[in-house]
Amino acid sequence: MGKIKKLDKNVVSRIAAGEAVAGPFSVVKELVENALDASATKIEIEILNGGKSYIKVKDNGEGMSRDDLLLSIEEHTTSKIEDFEDIYNLYSFGFRGEALSSISKVSKLVITSNDGKESNRLEVIGGKIKDIKEYPTSEKGTIVEVYDLFFNVPARRKFLKSDNVEKRYVVEYVEKFLLGNPDVEIVLKSDGEVVYNAVKGNLEDRFRLIFPEVREFTEVSGKYVKGIISSPSYYRNNRTGQIFFVQKRFVIDKMLYYIFETGYGEALLKHPYGVLFIEVPPRFVDVNVHPQKLEVKFSNPNVIYSDITRTVREGIKKFVSKKIFVKKEQNTVNENKLNYAYGPKSKPFQTNIEKNMLFNVEKKQLEVKRDIVVLKKRYVLFESNDGIYIMDFHAAHERILYDNIIKQLDEKVERLDLMIPIEIKIGKSFLQIAEGRKEDFKRFGFNIKIDKEKIIVLSIPSFIKPSDVVEVLMEILDEYRILGENPKSMKHIIADKACKKAVKTGYDILESEAKQLVEEVLKRGLTTCPHGRPLFLKITYKELDSFFERT
């Protein structure tokens, strides 16, 4: 008998449903998009335990008849298309006819719907209909309730995140939905508490709601694109503040991120905020290139990209004309001993990198044989017993400061109580992250309170300047949003961002300071900066002899 067997249809359907339904947030996404396709103007969402135990989406849309209700949970049943070519003339969100069918197979599903003529209630468990009956309701529309997601697929349920993280995923999706549909009233509740209660408005209202930290922005409009962009002086350390919609559908497209930032030109500092809507005739875009419809393909992308760049460039003229300056640090170094209590502003930390990529500088104390020479206010040259070394002064100073801060964070952190608390107004998804990480913040010297719409900072690590607190906290929250749960990352972000007194390239460096730094680096056996770049260029005497053809 052969080893290959045909899977049972029930097994196949549960596997397929598990692929289509990634987690609570994707259930919410599918149900909300169904509500929009039903012309809903008000949508209410409620979740319990991050959506793992209960999800409810209620809308005031067109509703469904008894026959449509029964068809809605069957595979590939839809009201949006009849043949394949209809995909290229779509204005709706759904079209594959798989959302409710997939959800019903991995949950206990209850749908109550009123189409204005009749009202019915359907109960489905694990894809099998348990009951359908008349169920009088006074309001036209549909209520979908999802209980015990993945109850019959334990392997999938096991891989769901914590309640707090799953809730955040739902909140982040709802924030995108709020931005993409300002003309729809939406309420989001989690474990009985109201997260969002957004009335109908315009894009500016929603932008302020989701990105309260951005105080300077403008509306832009081109041939195919319109939306809101921030001043270059408001930015994040990643692209989580950049949201794109194509035909009102949220998409993730690396090229769109790149083109958007290209429009900022020389005004670009890091990653500015932007919410852009791209509208083209349906036949010019393919929305069927990604399982979750998060990617699209344009038939003539260069036309779209040019319009985005041109539109953004016109928009930022309003800000550039205001002469946005980046504050420059003093171009001097304290003539006293180098301050090793502060650290660098640099890229995210890379762990466990101790190998010099250019030369194998052994981790041992070297003997500096002669005077130290400073080259071009940038490098330090010295001779040792086995050759000539050239050290990057800034990178070396940065490494020492970084290591000192990490050591403090591993031990007891000295706190500075703020006489005037610092208030940081941020979006709900960031508040959600902060709420779940209060103990981590406390461990590393921050005492914070979470309000309904802001973080209140009461104390900070003593080595962080109060003027840097907002930037440090926002970067920590950004990293958690992207990388997930990793307390170690908080430690390295704090060390990386907390201190900005590493001597920069081009600053005047006294020979006494250079000597002090070289001795400290050699004493510690350091070979790389915090990000893995080499500190030294080593040229052995043997290599010199070979170069000059001396034998």
Curated annotation (Swiss-Prot):
InterPro entries: DNA_mismatch_repair_CS, DNA_mismatch_repair_MutL, DNA_mismatch_S5_2-like, HATPase_C_sf, MutL/Mlh/PMS, MutL/Mlh/Pms-like, MutL_C, MutL_C_dimsub. It holds the Pfam family HATPase_c_3. One of its GO terms (cellular component) is mismatch repair complex. The keyword Nucleotidyltransferase does not apply. GO terms for molecular function: ATP binding; ATP hydrolysis activity; ATP-dependent DNA damage sensor activity; mismatched DNA binding. The keyword DNA repair applies. It comes from the Bacteria. SUPFAM superfamilies: ATPase domain of HSP90 chaperone/DNA topoisomerase II/histidine kinase, DNA mismatch repair protein MutL, Ribosomal protein S5 domain 2-like. SMART domains: DNA_mis_repair, MutL_C. Keywords: DNA damage, DNA repair. GO terms for biological process: mismatch repair. Belongs to the DNA mismatch repair MutL/HexB family. NCBIfam families: mutl (TIGR00585). This protein is involved in the repair of mismatches in DNA. It is required for dam-dependent methyl-directed DNA mismatch repair. May act as a 'molecular matchmaker', a protein that promotes the formation of a stable complex between two or more DNA-binding proteins in an ATP-dependent manner without itself being part of a final effector complex. This is DNA mismatch repair protein MutL. It comes from Thermosipho melanesiensis (strain DSM 12029 / CIP 104789 / BI429).
